[in-house]
């Protein structure tokens, strides 16, 4: 809190495009600043917007996904995808959605499905998943519609890489 107070004091005396209003500061301290208008201007400093996003995901999980059939998860992912794909790619609406649970529902929802239903994979399958997801990240980054699926490919690449790295560590310890 001391660092945040120092930041707001420095912000008050420094010329710049955006100065923090009282509601911006309350929003950061209350972890709901990503719900306020123009989130790009008020998410700094620190991870307050991310913690607010995690609280949103916890609420969505408890209200909509906890102990529910997998169809609820897929339906919520589809609704959130439709909302984002209906937005103007350069518009403020999409920018606001991306800072909230609607923008992160695809990787979060698939993470919940992965945790519930995924079976252990062998090393060769993990390697193929890792390479294909890296390839997908590059290819899907050039189009607005396919760009929506890039976070899912990043999550698949990350999880498969960590699992591969842990298997390499175990193999090295055996020798």
Locations of the language-model features?
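Helical transmembrane-bundle signal
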Residues: 4, 133-136
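Membrane-interface helix-loop-helix regions
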Residues: 1-53, 83-89, 101, 154-161
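Alpha-helical transmembrane segments of multi-pass integral membrane proteins
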Residues: 108, 135-175
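Loop-centered beta-sheet repeat module
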Residues: 61-62, 73-113
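Structural signal for the C-terminal ends of transmembrane alpha-helices
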Residues: 63-68, 85-88, 112-119, 140-141, ...
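Small-residue packing motifs within transmembrane alpha-helices
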Residues: 7, 100, 107, 129-132, ...
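Solvent-exposed interhelical
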Residues: 55-80, 112-129
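Membrane-interface helix caps and helix-loop-helix hairpins in membrane proteins
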Residues: 39-45, 87-98, 138-147
